[in-house]
Amino acid sequence: MQQLIDSLQKRGILDNSSAGLESLTAPVSAYLGFDPTAPSLHIGHWIGICFLRRLSAYGITPIALVGGATGMIGDPSGKSVERSLLDQEQVLDNSKKIEVALANYLPDIRIVNNADWLGSLSMVDFLRDIGKYFRLGSMLAKDVVKQRVYSEEGISYTEFSYLLLQSYDFAHLFKHHGVVLQCGGSDQWGNITSGIDYIRRKGLGQAFGLTYPLLTDSKGKKIGKTESGTVWLDPELTSPYELFQYFLRLSDQEIPKIARMLTLLDDDEVLALDKRLENDPQAVKRYVAEVIVKDVHGAEGLAQALATTESFFANKGKNITESELAALVQSGVGINVARADVIGKRWLDVVVQLGFCSSKGEARRLIQQRGLYVNQEPLIDEQSVLDGTYLCFDRYILLSQGKKKKQVIDLN
């Protein structure tokens, strides 16, 4: 365990840990949870997946927990307002998809679902076997609760009870699977320590916790969001090309943290990349992006991302062939649109309608600054109308915003 802690400290990704954790000796089992709030994991979850892989590399037996029950409640950690509750059918469907994804990324570890033990828990059992061991004073002192209780939004009893359910998860895994360590992001520390206290109060034994920092940008905002939404791991939602480009668009300052948290590159190589970053930031950024895309989508996904990038950028999109445009649409960077929905409309309206620009104001500003391109030619008149003269091969349109944001429109 000491070797793992030393490595995490060397990488700068150890946020908090329980006293005495370093003295644990093999065999040790640990778990990390994934709530099925969406049908796909996102790039933030990749940190947890890498963390479980890292535990395994240091001889710790990892377990991934899918929150089929807690996903019905919603973790208030890091949230200023209450989540919209998902119905049971949606959570069940999400859980199945998350379990399949985790089995793909973590083929050699156990995956459990807390719906198996929380789903049948009665209210009386909840109050007697769980609620009895928690004191309101300590619960109200938790940062996540404190921030919400005195806010205008407040906190519901449902969300307030979340940490009790997570604590019960830890106790269940401690008792039935020998799990003594819970891991998670820094926003989970309050929930983790509640579980440790619950296990102690129940007389089950000594448990431990370990957290890693949240992945944030220089402004403290969580990394993993774009103008078009969340960066998903499912290639149907975020293509390998889009994932690759997402990392290329990050600032140079964010790459060291990305390399430490989202890759399994060894500690010395990560430190060496820091030095290379000073002299050749683009090469380092591209290398890290390639490593992550290959890890997430395999060699085939990386090849697709690189081929799409080559089609778009090698010759600035000029002389692009019909087959290349078709491949771009297939790779996930294109959208299918009915001709009747856009032909005859102003470009100013079309780019907003397609979600390529967030508003007409943004579109107008880009046009005035010569920053919005149609088939690699700047759009210069905000009153211009989309007609047949803009179609490549009587079917495609290539939209570009600046140097990096591109999209193929298929009017088939």
Curated annotation (Swiss-Prot):
It catalyses: tRNA(Tyr) + L-tyrosine + ATP = L-tyrosyl-tRNA(Tyr) + AMP + diphosphate + H(+). It holds the Pfam family tRNA-synt_1b. It is an enzyme of class 6 (ligase). Coiled coil: none annotated. Residues 345-412 form the S4 RNA-binding domain. InterPro entries: aa-tRNA-synth_Ic, Rossmann-like_a/b/a_fold, S4_RNA-bd, S4_RNA-bd_sf, SYY-like_C, Tyr-tRNA-ligase, Tyr-tRNA-ligase_bac-type, Tyr-tRNA-ligase_bac_1. Keywords: Aminoacyl-tRNA synthetase, ATP-binding, Cytoplasm, Ligase, Nucleotide-binding, Protein biosynthesis, RNA-binding. A motif ('KMSKS' region) lies at residues 222-226. Its EC number is 6.1.1.1. It is found in: Cytoplasm. L-tyrosine binds at Y31, Y162, Q166. Belongs to the class-I aminoacyl-tRNA synthetase family. TyrS type 1 subfamily. Homodimer. Catalyzes the attachment of tyrosine to tRNA(Tyr) in a two-step reaction: tyrosine is first activated by ATP to form Tyr-AMP and then transferred to the acceptor end of tRNA(Tyr). This is Tyrosine--tRNA ligase. The lineage of its organism: Bacteria, Pseudomonadati, Chlamydiota, Chlamydiia, Chlamydiales. The gene is tyrS.
